[in-house]
């Protein structure tokens, strides 16, 4: 169960939140400039083909640059293995989050990282409802991130893949 203080803090963040579209080059520049670790250990030219088909955004909370996010508006998640879907048909219209990272400085200015991430996912839940998506899917690079996702309502399905059912 989520703490009331976390719910209230994330609600306040969500109300100030907006995404600003950025190009792939701008995304790489921000990753380098702010020391984001999302692509650590990955050969940018060979190992991230999904990066080039993903929409990227700056996460803004008011006028504070909070982080970056990349997602696809449509992703047929379990097309190769429909038995992996948590519910029949769930993978047909899912929002796939390819990358998400919150700036350390934003945590100091805005609030706890968990509240910021929950605010981002609450914002995306509204987006999904408006656009007919059935779930949000994302991967967790580390167990620490996986634990944060579990705290805000994501369910682990396999390995480091998580889903949030709408």
Residue ranges and their predicted role:
Residues 54, 130-133:
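Short, high-confidence coil segments that cap the C-terminus of an alpha-helix
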Residues 108-126:
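Conserved acetyl-CoA-binding loop-helix of GNAT-fold acetyltransferases
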Residues 136-147, 165:
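Conserved beta-strand-loop-alpha-helix junction that forms the acyl-donor binding cleft
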């Amino acid at each position: 169960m989520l703490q009331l203080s976390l719910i209230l803090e994330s609600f306040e963040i969500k109300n100030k939140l907006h995404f600003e579209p950025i190009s792939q080059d701008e995304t790489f520049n921000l990753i380098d400039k702010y020391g984001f670790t999302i692509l650590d250990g990955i050969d940018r030219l060979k190992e991230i083909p999904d990066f080039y088909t993903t929409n990227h955004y700056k996460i803004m909370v008011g006028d504070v640059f909070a982080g970056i996010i990349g997602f696809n508006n449509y992703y047929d998640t379990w097309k190769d293995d429909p038995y992996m879907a948590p519910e029949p048909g769930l993978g047909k219209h899912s929002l796939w989050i390819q990358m998400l990272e919150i700036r350390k400085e934003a945590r100091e200015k805005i609030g706890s990282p968990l509240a910021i991430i929950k605010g981002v996912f609450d914002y995306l839940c509204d987006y999904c409802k408006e656009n007919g998506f059935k779930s949000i899917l994302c991967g967790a690079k580390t167990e620490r991130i996986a634990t944060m996702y579990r705290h805000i309502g994501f369910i682990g399905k396999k390995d480091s893949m998580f889903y949030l059912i709408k």
